[in-house]
């Protein structure tokens, strides 16, 4: 039997899909989902989304929230501001893993900057004002933006420590790109159906997160570690799939905070 509660150890948002994480003390929710998470996305000349699978160097861009927007910087410290109020009239039809989405180019200047950094023509896009996207879970329709298939990813700190020992390599949680990091016994996250807050909010656990090659990319260098990849795959295999962490969605949540204690509902 699991312990009755767990604490939130860390929270992260990813303002631009596939770029570096931003550590936050609170995770806020509004009518569009997680505030500032995957709010923007890069697309190529064929309007296809850019991901870490094909562009490992995306992990090398860092984001900082400033007055009026997000400052994005490269490894050399050069950067540009993504202004909150910036907008263009250029509509871009794209998709996130087969889900068709109408977007709008955010800023031609920012698109040009990213194009120069990546040495290919790309555009930074955001949801068009009239566009919506929902994750259907039971009777709930949960809004979210450019996340892959589910609004949130929850990972277990102790499972990461065990994995590091198993592959004999110090692994940073940044490799797995969670929104919420909890503290539970190893692999206990797979036995949870929900985490419950005192104010009636819930994190519903949906299914284990199937993993590709991204965890083998060093988040500090952007280098794919070829020797580490098969070790991770071998250790993370469950029921024939390579998984780490749980996809989740938030129901009736207004805010989550680091240090917050949540009650556990077992699956």
Positions of PLM-derived features:
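Metal-cofactor-dependent catalytic cores
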Residues: 1-267
